[in-house]
Regions:
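Exposed aromatic-hydrophobic patches
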Residues: 118-128
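N-terminal prepro-regions of secreted/extracellular proteins
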Residues: 1-67
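Solvent-exposed strand-loop boundary residues in beta-sheet-rich modules
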Residues: 99-102, 144-146
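A short, structured loop/turn motif at beta-sheet edges
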Residues: 68-72, 98-101, 127-134, 161
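Solvent-exposed serine/threonine-rich low-complexity stretches and specific carbohydrate-binding patches
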Residues: 93, 102-117
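Short beta-strand elements
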Residues: 145-161
Length: 161
């Protein structure tokens, strides 16, 4: 009985070592590559700031942030800024993970809309599965009367064990 318990324990340890190495290898294999515009990093936080290519009348900038706050917990936040108060200012964020070479949506935060304001911010924390690269993709918009301005962007990605 004792010999059998030791054998099972050794087998379990061997499995943990093999599968743990496989996850690290998957991360290492892609580290430093660019997938759909996002650099895959070994950090624990990524962000972006986007400004319209042509200066708009209302939309000034948008930001998106994604950070590892605890074991498999990601905080996603973002904002949209306008040059002046507008009828509607909004931000929508998408938490994405890399699956078989493509970014797929995990969850959506927003749209968060403020009225008669120049700034909007939103934030939330999510539990995620390990073994993937994650990034934040965001949409930012301003509406004043019949004028609508919008911009999208995305961050780099980082590995969650």
């Amino acid at each position: 009985m004792r010999k059998r318990s030791r054998m099972l324990l050794m087998l379990l340890m061997l499995c943990c070592m093999v599968f743990g190495t496989m996850h690290a290898s998957a991360a290492d294999e892609l580290l430093g590559t660019v997938v759909d515009g996002s650099l895959l990093t070994d950090g624990t936080e990524v962000s972006y700031t986007v400004t319209p290519k042509a200066r708009g009348t209302y939309l000034a900038s948008g930001t998106g942030n994604l950070g590892l706050t605890a074991y498999r917990k990601l905080n996603m936040s973002g904002s949209t800024s306008c040059y002046q108060a507008v009828d509607k200012v909004k931000v929508t964020l998408y938490l994405q993970r890399l699956v078989n070479g493509s970014w797929v949506n995990v969850t959506t935060l927003g749209p968060k809309t403020d009225y008669n304001d120049y700034y909007v911010y939103t934030s939330n924390t999510y539990s995620v599965a390990g073994g993937y690269y994650y990034r934040v993709y965001g949409g930012h918009g301003a509406i004043e009367g019949s004028v609508s301005e919008a911009q999208t962007s995305y961050s780099d990605g980082f590995w969650v064990s």
